[in-house]
Amino acid sequence: FPEIKIILAHLGHPYEHETVCVIRKHPNLYADISALYFRPFQLYHSLMLVQEYGVWHKLLFGTDYPFTTVNGTIDGLRRLNNMLEGTALPRLDSDQIEAMIHRKSLSLLGLE
């Protein structure tokens, strides 16, 4: 069903790498990042895959409310690079994180 837009919740957790590969391959597949900031290093690693594969535009902001909140999720995303201080690990692109937070998801999915 290539005309149907499909969103894979939680970036496909625990199969984030596979999910990144699948959303890269199929133009009608997207993923959200809901509830993932509870495991910050795992989220960092998953978003680094997103960055390396060039699929930031396929990610949607999500919170998994009521278990998490909008503000908690945004704060968690914005703090991800902070845990890398003192390391040589590559940083996530802060502009891409902000773009994901503010993305017009409904129009992207053809729902507006």
What are these model-derived regions, one by one?
Residues 55-60, 71-112:
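Mid-to-C-terminal alpha-helical segments outside catalytic/metal-binding sites
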Residues 64:
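Catalytic cores of Mg2+-dependent Asp-rich isoprenoid enzymes
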